[in-house]
């Protein structure tokens, strides 16, 4: 599987551990940075990776910042991208099977490398539960607002 990886300065070490794990499993990794030699701001890395995953250039993505939360918020602004902060393997599996997440975000300051590898494995080894009742799940009311942003909403008021 072709997996995009990215991190801010707080996630470089964990991203590298995840990358080595994925390469050992035979995955292709597209590392967009940052690195110890070339740190990049979290928002820049997130936009680039979300673009690659949203366009299909990468099948899945893993982003690592201080807590994972900021990158998830930004990634979810991209069309066709569902990103979830995952702090354990069960959450990663549910993010895939129920929410169809294609990017997970991890906290470089709060997630141990061994746990990150378990989380990534659960994420990659779980499929989306297709065939579920979207109407009962309330997907349509959410999709109506898919291109809304905070700024568009406050301008209307």
List where the protein language model places each region.
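Residues at secondary-structure transition points
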Residues: 9, 13, 37-44, 66, ...
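Short, structured coil segments at secondary-structure junctions
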Residues: 25, 78-79, 99
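Helix-adjacent hinge/juxtasegments
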Residues: 45, 49-85
């Amino acid at each position: 599987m072709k997996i995009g990886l990215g991190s801010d300065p707080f996630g470089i070490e964990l991203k590298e551990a995840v990358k080595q794990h994925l390469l050992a499993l035979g995955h292709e990794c597209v590392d967009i940075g940052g690195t110890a030699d070339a740190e990049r701001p979290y928002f820049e890395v997130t936009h680039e990776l979300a673009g690659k995953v949203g366009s299909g250039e990468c099948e899945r993505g893993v982003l690592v910042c201080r807590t994972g939360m900021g990158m998830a918020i930004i990634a979810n602004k991209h069309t066709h991208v569902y990103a979830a902060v995952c702090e354990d393997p069960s959450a990663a599996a549910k993010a895939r099977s129920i929410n169809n997440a294609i990017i997970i975000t991890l906290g470089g300051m709060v997630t141990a490398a061994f746990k990150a590898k378990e989380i990534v494995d659960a994420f990659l080894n779980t499929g989306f539960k297709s065939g579920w009742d979207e109407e009962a799940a309330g997907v349509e009311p959410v999709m109506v607002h898919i291109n809304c942003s905070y700024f568009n909403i406050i301008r209307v008021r």
